[in-house]
Amino acid sequence: MNRDEVAKTFAALKAHREASQETIADLFRVDPNRFENFHIKLDDVLFDYSKHRVTRTTLDLLFALARAAGVEDRRSQLFDGAAVNITEHRPALHMALRKLDGAPVLAEGKDVMPEVLAERQKIFTFAEAIRKGTIKAANGERFTDIVNIGIGGSDLGPRMVVTALAPFVADHLTMHFVSNVDGADLGDTLKKLPLATTLFIVCSKTFTTLETMTNAQTAREAVAEKLGEAAVADHFCAVSTQLDKIAAFGIKSDRVFGFWDWVGGRYSVWSAIGLSVVIAIGAEKFEKFLLGGQDIDQHFQTAPLESNVPVIMALLEIWYRDLWDYATRAVIPYDERMHRFSAYLQQLEMESNGKSVQLSGAPVTESTSPVVWGEPGTNGQHAFFQMLHQGTEIVPIDFLVAAQPSGADAKHHQLLVANCLAQSQALMQGRSLEDVKTLLTAQGLDTAAVNTLAPHKVFPGNRPSSTFLYKRLSPRVLGQLIALYEHKVFVEGVIWNVDSFDQWGVELGKELANKLTPIIRDSEASLEGLDGSTAGLIGEIRKHKKG
């Protein structure tokens, strides 16, 4: 990385941005073939970035920025198994988890693929046995309900994928996900469960995660109370590496599945953490999911920057975050089953790049991760789209939509697609004051009424968006979409010069919670040393306990 060259390119981009006068609509008028020139079609996903406020000059400067930052070299290091997670001295080789050909992948000189393939086969064998009923509940019946207990990457990924791929889930299985230490999460789930035919998957690499183990212990108590202590071994399995703790919990050793330190939590759905996904959709469909991720790995690793979708996605983010100072990005899938996708991306993007320190330990020189948020269309249109169209903050948007439905009524889907395309069009084009006045006059309003109402009905337009279009949402397509965002995040981290694979920001709160827990449990514990606000709040909590 050449930081001087990076700074120089950022300065050139700033000058270019200040000189930019054209609206997005202007760019379409200048170039009638803009869509053809500003979209990339992969095997199953079309990425349309024509509705962005960028020209060829903009993109050339952004590609120069990527090269100055060393994106190509760092990409090679990533795939070569270098310790790109510098604060924890680890590689980030989640790509190996979705590699299907078994070709060597090295981590510190060791080929990890034999272990990856062996663990994958172990997961597949167990999952298929659960699906077919050859592994049974304690009463000899087939399992009907699967509960994944985890938090963070051990919940967000599996929950999102299973929800998104609902049409592919086995009819005889009902999937549940529990993450929050709030007892209502597990309690409400337990009320719905036929415990006699329920399998619990406990996902915690260390088998010490506070939220996960609290929920797991409560679930264990429920099983032991209703079905007997001996049933615990039949109704629990684990994704962890701590065999001694798992044995003490009562889980059989052949029902334990592991993964490696080079798999970050937010990249772990491809690993044994995805066991609930494999049980839900089956090994064959899960391989299609892995194939989708592998498709994008190959594209990202080999495509020139100028035609590399994750690179362009990242550069657009940099352009808006650092040159236009847009602080948020919305992700709007026009697919109800994708309603957890934006939450999944929140962790992937904000935990990875929500950093203020460079690799060297010096403060960053540019703004880093935006706030990522969103809801499915068309629901969002009746909630926050008012702000997107007419608010004072400009929010770049990612739209995701399938050309064909997955088992839904065609009439419904046609309306869904029309709304998706209409929103991106309206955000780009807007509606001028002159056009509004013409429309109101045509509706019969007098001049005074027109002049009063017209300003309220103006749409500024020039609001940027990307559209991801695919035939229908399948395991392979979902794998492609996830991997596109994973590699986007990596490229951004290289340019911002941060470690995208650690998450020290989650530690302080956990540390303080551990100190406060005994104080909250013991009403006589001293509040000495606490700040005034925290002490005051605990005092009020103690009053409520007495009441």
Swiss-Prot record:
<feature type="active site" description="Proton donor">
    <location>
        <position position="351"/>
    </location>
</feature>
<dbReference type="InterPro" id="IPR018189">
    <property type="entry name" value="Phosphoglucose_isomerase_CS"/>
</dbReference>
<dbReference type="InterPro" id="IPR035482">
    <property type="entry name" value="SIS_PGI_2"/>
</dbReference>
<dbReference type="GO" id="GO:0005829">
    <property type="term" value="C:cytosol"/>
</dbReference>
<dbReference type="Pfam" id="PF00342">
    <property type="entry name" value="PGI"/>
</dbReference>
<keyword id="KW-0324">Glycolysis</keyword>
<dbReference type="GO" id="GO:0051156">
    <property type="term" value="P:glucose 6-phosphate metabolic process"/>
</dbReference>
<comment type="similarity">
    <text>Belongs to the GPI family.</text>
</comment>
<dbReference type="InterPro" id="IPR001672">
    <property type="entry name" value="G6P_Isomerase"/>
</dbReference>
<feature type="active site">
    <location>
        <position position="382"/>
    </location>
</feature>
<keyword id="KW-0413">Isomerase</keyword>
<feature type="active site">
    <location>
        <position position="510"/>
    </location>
</feature>
<dbReference type="GO" id="GO:0006096">
    <property type="term" value="P:glycolytic process"/>
</dbReference>
<keyword id="KW-0312">Gluconeogenesis</keyword>
<dbReference type="GO" id="GO:0097367">
    <property type="term" value="F:carbohydrate derivative binding"/>
</dbReference>
<dbReference type="InterPro" id="IPR023096">
    <property type="entry name" value="G6P_Isomerase_C"/>
</dbReference>
<dbReference type="InterPro" id="IPR035476">
    <property type="entry name" value="SIS_PGI_1"/>
</dbReference>
<dbReference type="InterPro" id="IPR046348">
    <property type="entry name" value="SIS_dom_sf"/>
</dbReference>
<dbReference type="GO" id="GO:0048029">
    <property type="term" value="F:monosaccharide binding"/>
</dbReference>
<comment type="pathway">
    <text>Carbohydrate biosynthesis; gluconeogenesis.</text>
</comment>
<keyword id="KW-0963">Cytoplasm</keyword>
<dbReference type="GO" id="GO:0006094">
    <property type="term" value="P:gluconeogenesis"/>
</dbReference>
<dbReference type="GO" id="GO:0004347">
    <property type="term" value="F:glucose-6-phosphate isomerase activity"/>
</dbReference>
<protein>
    <recommendedName>
        <fullName>Glucose-6-phosphate isomerase</fullName>
        <ecNumber>5.3.1.9</ecNumber>
    </recommendedName>
</protein>
<comment type="pathway">
    <text>Carbohydrate degradation; glycolysis; D-glyceraldehyde 3-phosphate and glycerone phosphate from D-glucose: step 2/4.</text>
</comment>
<comment type="function">
    <text>Catalyzes the reversible isomerization of glucose-6-phosphate to fructose-6-phosphate.</text>
</comment>
